[in-house]
Amino acid sequence: KHWKVRLSDPNPEVREKSRIGLAQAMREAKGVGGTSVLLVPGRVKGDQETHQHVWDRSIEQIRKLIPLASELKIHILIETVWNGFCYKPEQFRDYIDAINSPWVQAYYDIGNMQKYGPSHKWIRILGNRALKLDVKDWGSKNGFCPLGQGDVDWKKVRHELEQIEFRGWATREGNDGGV
C-alpha cells in the first residue's frame, strides 16, 4: 500500500489514511513482539509531489507518530528505495536528522542504493542511523543479482559496518538464486 497510500500524497485525506495505516502497523508489530516497522515515506511523482513535498509532508506525518513509537517502543525505519527521494546519502542522513527522534531511523537496503553510489559510502555517512539492513547485490550490468556478482564491495561494506559498530538485524532479501 505504501506506493498508493503515501504520507507525501498531495491529498491531505490520503496522507491521513497513510498515517493511520502506519499507526496500525506499529500496534500490530508490538502485538507480535516486533521492534520496528518499515516505511517508504513517499514517492516523487511530478509537480504535485516533488522532492520537497515528500520531505515536508512525510516529516509532518511521521512526527505525529513519534509519541506512539515511544509509547510502544517501536522504531519507524525509513527504507531506501527507488522512489525518487533522497538518492544521495547526505540527503538521506539529513532527512532522518530533520525528524529528530531516536524512534525514527534508517532501514538501509545495501543493494537498492548501490545504483546511486557505493554502499559502503552510504553506511559511513548514515552511521548509527542505520538500525537494520537489507542484504542484496546490484550491478550496473546485471541489476539485482546473486550476492558477490554485482557491484557491491562487500569487504568495504563489512569494514564500514564494523566502523559504525553495527549490531542490528540484517535480512537477506531477494529471489536471485544466490546464497
Question: What function would you assign to each model-found segment?
Answer:
Residues 2-108, 113-115:
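Active-site acidic/histidine proton-transfer and metal-coordination neighborhood
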Residues 27, 35, 63, 89-179:
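Histidine-acidic metal/acid-base catalytic patches
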